[in-house]
Amino acid sequence: MQSVQGTQAMSDPTAVRPADKRAFLKWAVLGAVGIVNGYATILMYSRGEVAFALLTLILTTLALYIFGSRKTYAHRYIYPGIAGMILFILFPLAYTVGLAFTNYSAKNQLTLERAQSVLMDQTFQSGESYAFQLYKTEQGYRLLIEDGDERLATAPFSLSGNVPTDLNLEVIGGIDGEVEPIKTIIGYRTELSGIDLHFPDGEDIRMSGLRKFAAVKPLYTLQDDGETLTNNQSGQVLRPNMEIGFYQPINESGEFVGERVSPGFVVSIGTHNFERVWKDEGIKEPFINIFIWTVIFSVLTVIFTLMIGLVLASVVQWEALKGRAVYRVLLILPYAVPAFISILIFRGLFNQSFGEINMVLNGLFGLSPAWFSDPLLAKTMVLIVNTWLGFPYMMIFCMGLLKAIPDDLYEASAIDGANFIHNFTKITLPMMIKPLTPLLIASFAFNFNNFVMIQLLTQGGPNRIGTSEPAGYTDLLVSYTYRIAFEGTGGQDFGLASAIATLIFLLVGALALLNLRFTKLSQQ
């Protein structure tokens, strides 16, 4: 009986198979992903974020194709990695390079259309201003305007829901109601700003402050060409200057004259930001000095951490040393503590007035070094702290490499009468240098862009004098870029910072390639 029922169930065309359920669920999920991301793409594009809209479109299209087609089944396992690489590496890189060729800054953030709209919204007071009061009556709110000895008021209206945009003023003797405090006016400021009041003689006034209504007019009028603006107060004619990204007044011959008018807008300026790095002495000189210091800092950090790490790795693996496990744990602690905590602790220890290091030096030798004021001492302090943070990692790596070297080699060298120097130069170093090379290159690249270290310890200080942009003696290129982008004297200059970031990328890439090239030559 059960077999007959099973046969009938298998032959029933209305029965839903598990494979059909999985297919339906898959296409339902893919459809939902496509709809949500498609809607997000449209929103971003409509708001002018073309780059982010294109990124979302590419990632979504790839996901739908890879997970929806049987031909690309194997690619499903590598798609998360590819998407992450596009999202966190390629896109930021391309976006930064793109910004380097624009004037994008704190003063130039809008599009031309948006900047024009902001200017069109500006107004100026073209007539007398009048004090007002907001009354609350049983029928609603009323505005009272005082024109000399004359008192005029509006009809009752509502400030919630359907707020009127035009109200007539009539001469009255008084109002039965309570005067609203200033906090109520502040709360309804948006609604009150949209109301036009009309005097009996035809004069129109609008809210010009928390206590005043005045006759105001648009400051600019847009001409028929869709770009030219006329200043209704001064009569000046303005046009967008596409070379600097600002509206500027023009003379009768159409040449730009006078001061630029904010807000600015984003325009393409070609290689101007890169040219500033080499032509502006206020940027060129600190850039070259900071680049040299960055290379020295990275190289010395790698050398110091490797030397200390290798020596300590050899010591803690010395069989005659008792308590080696305890020493290993203690020496690894600097690596276990989060770097930002250690940096802030060292910042307190090196404090020139209250730091424990200066207290000890002053008590023993009568010295009180100016760690944060003297350029040489500041660089020394940075190297000391960075070496402290980096040697445990090198020590751990060297411990593993030393374990991999056969003891027979050292026994044979001992029979030949070799000392520890010959053992290190002829056995240890040659066998460790090949696996160490990628680590040393990675350590160099990391310290080349060690922003956290500089920002938390010295913030780039002490500052250099006579530079166009903020720059310090301990600044690395990456922290110098950050200061230009967010602490610039002339405002946040994201375009120039992006140009320097692009140069940093090219420099680090070139140095890494040179290191790899020299490594291959030395191995050959």
From Swiss-Prot:
Q: Which GO terms describe its molecular function?
A: ABC-type maltose transporter activity
Compartment annotation: Cell inner membrane
Residue ranges of domain ABC transmembrane type-1 in the record: 291-515
Which controlled-vocabulary keywords does the entry list? Answer: Cell inner membrane, Cell membrane, Membrane, Sugar transport, Transmembrane, Transmembrane helix, Transport
Q: How does it sit in the membrane?
A: Multi-pass membrane protein
Periplasmic face residues = 46-49, 105-289, 348-379, 459-493
Pfam families in the cross-refs: BPD_transp_1, MalF_N_TM, MalF_P2
Q: Which GO terms describe its biological process?
A: maltodextrin transmembrane transport
Predominant location: membrane
Could you tell me the superkingdom of the organism this chain comes from? Bacteria
Under the heading InterPro entries, the entry gives: MalF_N, MalF_N_TM, MalF_P2, MalF_P2_sf, MetI-like, MetI-like_sf
Q: Which residues lie on this side of the membrane: Cytoplasmic?
A: 1-22, 70-81, 313-324, 403-435, 517-524
What are the transmembrane regions?
23-45, 50-69, 82-104, 290-312, 325-347, 380-402, 436-458, 494-516
Q: Name one GO cellular component term.
A: maltose transport complex
The UniProt record lists the keyword Transmembrane: yes
> Briefly, what is this protein's role?
Part of the ABC transporter complex MalEFGK involved in maltose/maltodextrin import. Probably responsible for the translocation of the substrate across the membrane.
Concerning its family, UniProt says: Belongs to the binding-protein-dependent transport system permease family. MalFG subfamily.
> How is the subunit organization of this protein annotated in UniProt?
The complex is composed of two ATP-binding proteins (MalK), two transmembrane proteins (MalG and MalF) and a solute-binding protein (MalE).
Q: What is the protein name for this chain?
A: Maltose/maltodextrin transport system permease protein MalF
**Phylogenetic classification of the source organism:** Bacteria, Pseudomonadati, Pseudomonadota, Gammaproteobacteria, Vibrionales
